[in-house]
Every structure is written in C-alpha cells, then in structure tokens.
Amino acid sequence: MDVFMKGLSKAKEGVVAAAEKTKQGVAEAAGKTKEGVLYVGSKTKEGVVHGVATVAEKTKEQVTNVGGAVVTGVTAVAQKTVEGAGSIAAATGFVKKDQLGKNEEGATQEGILEDMPVDPDNEAYEMPSEEGYQDYEPEA
C-alpha cells in the first residue's frame, strides 16, 4: 500500500508541474493571439479605409466618361456606395465613426463629383428601342 501511495504522490506532483507549465503556455499563447488579432485588425482597417477611397476615386474617374444627363444618377450611386462601405467599416469597428466622410487628405468626400467638369463632346448613351424586348414572366 505504501508503494501505491508513493506512486500517487509522484503522479500528483507531475500533474501539478504539468498544470503550472500549461498555465504559463496558455498565458503566452493568449498574449500572442491578442497581438495577432490586433495586427490583423489594424491591417484590415487600413484596407477598408483605402478601399473606400479607391471606390470613390474609381467612380469619379468613370463619371468623367459619362454624359451630363447621367452624372446626377452616378453621383448619387457613388455617394451611396461610399456611405455603405463606410457604414460597414464603422459597424465592424475597423473605422471610427468620426473618420467617416473624410478621405486620406482629411477633406470631406461629399460633393467630390459635383465640381467635376463634364465634357460635352462625349457621346450620350442611347437606350435601345423597346421593340426588341420580350415581357418576362417568372415561372411559378
């Protein structure tokens, strides 16, 4: 019985030592995980901010190729696109709400397309006649 108790005592010491090592390992792993999550979060934030600015810039470039009658609609779509991307960024916590509506230079993005000159020499897009279209009825 003495041998049995001595064996259990040794096992208990081993478990205590393993638990202590595990506790240290878990604490270290938690610290590294936190660092990793913060790094990914900061990189994602940079990507979201850059992405929103890129969407606005590309939309602005495309508007210069569009006739004057369509500019108003495209401007509204571009503004809603930027607002939507900003809302997603704010909702996910990657961008603070007070950072929304500012581009990388710190100027507001509102009105970015309104001051843009429109080239009157661009050909306007003409809608095709409705004769070539068929009514679509979805299947039940």
Curated annotation (Swiss-Prot):
Subunit structure: Soluble monomer. Homotetramer. A dynamic intracellular population of tetramers and monomers coexists normally and the tetramer plays an essential role in maintaining homeostasis. Interacts with UCHL1. Interacts with phospholipase D and histones. Interacts (via N-terminus) with synphilin-1/SNCAIP; this interaction promotes formation of SNCA inclusions in the cytoplasm. Interacts with CALM1. Interacts with STXBP1; this interaction controls SNCA self-replicating aggregation. Interacts with SNARE components VAMP2 and SNAP25; these interactions allows SNARE complex assembly and integrity.
GO molecular function, one term: identical protein binding
Modified residues (Phosphoserine): S87, S129
Family: Belongs to the synuclein family.
Modification Phosphotyrosine occurs at: Y125
Keyword field contains Repeat: yes
Main subcellular location: cytoplasm
Positions of Cu cation binding: D2, H50
Keywords tagged on the record: Acetylation, Cell projection, Copper, Cytoplasm, Membrane, Metal-binding, Nucleus, Phosphoprotein, Repeat, Secreted, Synapse, Ubl conjugation
Gene Ontology process terms (BP): chemical synaptic transmission; regulation of dopamine secretion; synapse organization; synaptic vesicle endocytosis
Protein name, entry field: Alpha-synuclein
Signal peptide: none
Biased composition (Acidic residues): 112-140
Segments of this protein annotated with the region Interaction with SERF1A: 111-140
Designated gene of the protein: SNCA
